[in-house]
Amino acid sequence: MSVALGVSHTAGGTQFAVTARDAERVELCLFEGKREIRQAMQRRDGVHIAVAGVAPGQRYGYRAHGPWAPEQGLMFDSTKLLVDPYATRLDSRFQYDARLSLRGVDTALLVPKAIVPAPMDVAAPPPPVFTPGGLIYELNVRGFTQKHPAVPPQLRGTIRALAHPAIIAHFKKLGVNAIELMPIVAWIDERHLPPLGLRNAWGYNPVVPMAIDPGLAPGGLEELEDTVVDLRRAGIGVILDLVLNHTGESDLLGPTLSLRGLDNRCYARAPDGALVNHAGTGNILDASDSVVRAMMLGTLRHFARLGVDGFRFDLATILARSPGFDPRAPIFAEIANDPLLQDRILIAEPWDMGPEGYRLGQFPDGWLEWNDRYRDDVRRFWRGDGGTLGRLATRMTGSSDIFSGKCSRSVNFVASH
């Protein structure tokens, strides 16, 4: 793609670019307090572009104009303020509100604003600390230190708390080689939770893939970068659990927050206008589209530049569906051929909820895979089930029945989120 999507700094000013192929027009919305200034964007091959004389720290969003025809996959509503899919920082957390789903109701006061970032250094990331065969510790960032007495109160429940000496000492005592952070990018509660007085605590309902939830990193990306540096010094790598299979905009009754309002037919897999639900969340992203894959790859590069060792891909089979699972899907080659990503740790959750979605052992060379057969057979042996000794031996020696000749690809686990 010739135009860099998201925000980029040019000699002529700050450039904003967003894909909206079916939109009649798109507006850039700049915010000064509650005042909204709208600027028409120019269209170039389905990408809408605007240049404004604004500085880092400027708050912004988009409005897309076009037809409302859900049966055709078109869900435009210019009253909805839309968050930039390439945003790297937000001014607040997402809060579910029923008005986010109501057509014709303005949502400028209900959604976070993206923040124009300062230019980033583009130095190549250091090689991963973690090597396959090491011990991975999965954790929820907020819950892990929320009540830890040794962590200062202002740090508890944040990413920076993970680099506190008491936390690092705990990891070292356990022999941890890498921590795997459950989703840290900005997410929204599912609509059934607020009426019950509940919140989504785990974060598996993301809205935009590159912006860390402000509650976990009040100081922005630098807090993740600094934490990664501190943990690397202790010999501990960082792996991010990424949800690139769906967005928190849910089904046809869900909120319009970003991708749905900009380019639903591009981003969501929706043949004949019907949203596919192989993630059990109301929608899935369509990785057969090059625009969607570009966003996914941009997300991986973005976090790789911050020094993370690699990624665990939630419901990873969805990334290779077209509509069925394809072990030669374009996303695999694009990751393998990307200079920033070639040496990153790649871990697949090798299943989804769709037809023939269980694909353990079928990901390409270079990928590790969560091995639920190890989990089940070890648990059965511990429980005392008869006839399990042979299966236990197979699991303890690399699951050769699944990973023939590639036993080092198995990620063995007994418990997870």
Per-range role (PLM):
Residues M1-A11, E36, R43-G46, V54-E138, ...:
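The feature marks proteins involved in alpha-glucan
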Residues G12-F16:
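Structural beta-strand segments of beta-rich domains
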Residues T19-R25, A55:
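Short proline/glycine-enriched turn/loop motifs at strand-loop junctions of beta-rich domains
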Residues E27-C29:
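Beta-strand signatures of extracellular beta-sandwich domains
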Residues A55, P128-G133, K172-K173, P339-L341, ...:
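Extracellular/periplasmic catalytic domains that process cell-envelope and extracellular macromolecules
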Residues A87, I115, I318, S322, ...:
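Conserved alpha/beta catalytic core and glycan-binding cleft of carbohydrate-active enzymes
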Residues N140-G310, A316-I335:
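Substrate-binding/active-site clefts of carbohydrate-active enzymes
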